[in-house]
């Protein structure tokens, strides 16, 4: 849910600064976002993920994680599940509605001696499946305060989506992975990015973002996104093809 934040005030000559100019109103409001992690919540998929990770230690660890999540202490639950600081950092966005300030606009460098009447900020928001459009706007507004206006930017809103891991296809994925990877367990997971699921799930089609891949060799960085590190290891291509073929074949034969 991408939003635009607008601060307004009287514009005037820069020789007369004030505390209530638009740029300062906006700056003060944005600081209230803190680190951008706005609302903690464990959706069913990520509850199952933490429970599965913790269960690798013991059944007690899994029960303890469940108890901590019931109290809404998601950061503590990740640590209790056994994640190291880097693991917590990477997993944390999947337990929060988040807001990242990505662009600012105010005034004109050619008129640097003029205090602008408007100042704008653009926020890329990522919302969990239980959040709504208005709910997120209200959440952002509650952090920013009343000095600014918050609007959805160019109608760029997509609901958070989640497929049930109780679906039959998920069971086949678990079975094939266990067969081909020495009994490895599949951990349900949520994606913090935007995918074609937003077009398919509303039409009743469950979507699972599953890309089979072996661990990368020591010293090789994992793939990233939107840069020259958005890649796949070539030796994983035939492995992925074989696993996916096996999954589709088994699933269709049982249908």
Task: For every predicted segment, state its role.
Residues 7, 125-127:
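Hydrophobic beta-strand positions in extracellular immunoglobulin-like domains
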Residues 24-31, 174, 238-241, 245:
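Predominant activation on well-ordered alpha-helical scaffold segments within soluble catalytic domains
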Residues 153-165:
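Short proline/glycine- and acidic-rich turn/helix-capping motifs at secondary-structure junctions
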Residues 157, 183-242, 246-254:
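Zn-dependent metallopeptidase/amidohydrolase metal-coordination segment
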Residues 1-4, 14-104, 114, 129-150:
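Acidic-enriched catalytic cores of C-N bond-cleaving enzymes acting on peptides and small amides
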Residues 111-122, 136:
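Glycine-rich, aromatic-lined ligand/substrate-binding cores of catalytic
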Residues 30-39, 60-63, 164-214:
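Active-site-adjacent substrate-binding region
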Residues 108-113, 216:
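Short beta-strand/turn micro-motifs at beta-sheet edges
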């Amino acid at each position: 849910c991408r939003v635009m934040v607008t601060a307004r005030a009287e514009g005037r000559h820069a020789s007369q600064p004030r505390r209530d100019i638009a740029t300062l109103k906006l700056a003060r409001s944005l600081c209230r976002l803190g680190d951008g992690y706005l609302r903690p919540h464990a959706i069913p998929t990520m509850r199952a993920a933490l429970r599965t990770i913790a269960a690798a230690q013991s059944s007690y660890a899994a029960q303890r994680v469940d108890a901590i999540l019931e109290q809404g202490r998601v950061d503590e639950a990740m640590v209790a599940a056994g994640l190291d600081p880097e693991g917590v950092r990477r997993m944390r966005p999947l337990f929060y509605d988040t807001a990242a300030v990505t662009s600012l606009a105010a005034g004109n460098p050619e008129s640097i001696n003029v205090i602008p009447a408007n100042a704008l900020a653009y926020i890329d928001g990522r919302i969990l499946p239980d959040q709504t459009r208005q709910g997120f706007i209200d959440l952002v507004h509650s952090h920013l305060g009343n000095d600014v206006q918050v609007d959805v930017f160019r109608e760029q809103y997509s609901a958070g989506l989640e497929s049930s891991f109780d679906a039959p296809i998920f069971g086949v994925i678990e079975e094939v992975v266990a067969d081909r990877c020495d009994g490895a367990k599949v951990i349900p997971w949520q994606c913090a990015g935007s995918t074609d699921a937003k077009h398919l799930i509303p039409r009743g089609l469950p979507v699972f973002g599953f890309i089979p891949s072996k661990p990368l060799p020591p010293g090789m960085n994992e793939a990233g996104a939107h840069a020259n590190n958005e890649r796949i290891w070539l030796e994983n291509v035939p492995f992925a093809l074989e696993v996916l073929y096996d999954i589709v074949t088994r699933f269709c034969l049982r249908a």
